Regions:
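Conserved, function-critical positions that sit in or immediately flank catalytic
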Residues: 54-178
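Extended assembly-interface regions of large multimeric machines
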Residues: 1-28, 34-80
Length: 178
């Protein structure tokens, strides 16, 4: 199902809670794909789990003690550690949080006739109600968007759109949906 209408928090076998930021969604797989790898890392920045190439991107949020999990866990809710706001165990995650930062750009339509084939465009701005977000756009051999990676998450966004023309790509024959 669509990432937007799904539950997307997971508790792994080490009691680490992660949020799914990308579920393998692409123009070819608009509803995503099954996850094949368990996210087990505690890195502060989002990353893929494992080596399957399932297209998932995970962000580690926190680790919860089994004793706290047992009290409040359900299929509808995921408990947060009781000392989340003050405890040192999760301070690095709290300190790394950016209100309204953009972590992922979803490609819904790759477009047609975009720029130069096999070229990478850097510092492409993400316009919206926040500021500072940028991404790198890779145009594939078919002159379509091959990938988009956020390189600066910016802050204070509630929505954003990749501005490919301001990023140096010439006006395409058909605009992509990002």
């Amino acid at each position: 199902t669509s990432l937007y209408s799904s539950n997307y928090y997971v508790l792994n076998s080490d009691f680490r809670v992660c949020i799914c930021l990308k579920n393998g969604t692409s123009p070819e797989n608009p509803d995503g794909k099954p996850s094949l790898d368990e996210p087990t890392f505690t890195d502060l920045e989002p990353k893929s789990a494992g080596t399957s190439g399932d297209g998932y991107l995970w962000k580690y949020l926190y680790t919860i003690k089994p004793s706290e999990l047992i009290k409040f866990d359900s299929t509808e809710f995921m408990p947060v550690p009781s000392d989340w706001a003050t405890g040192s165990d999760n301070s690095s995650v709290r300190d790394n949080a950016v209100d309204g930062g953009i972590k992922v750009v979803v490609i819904q339509n790759r477009g047609v006739g975009l720029g130069t084939a096999n070229r990478t465009y850097t510092r492409v701005p993400i316009k919206g109600d926040g500021s500072g977000a940028e991404c790198t756009v890779v145009v594939n051999a078919d002159q379509q968007i091959g990938s988009v990676d956020v390189t600066n998450q910016g802050s204070n966004y509630t929505f954003g759109t990749v501005d490919i023309v301001a990023g140096g790509l010439p006006r395409p024959d058909s605009y992509p949906q990002l």
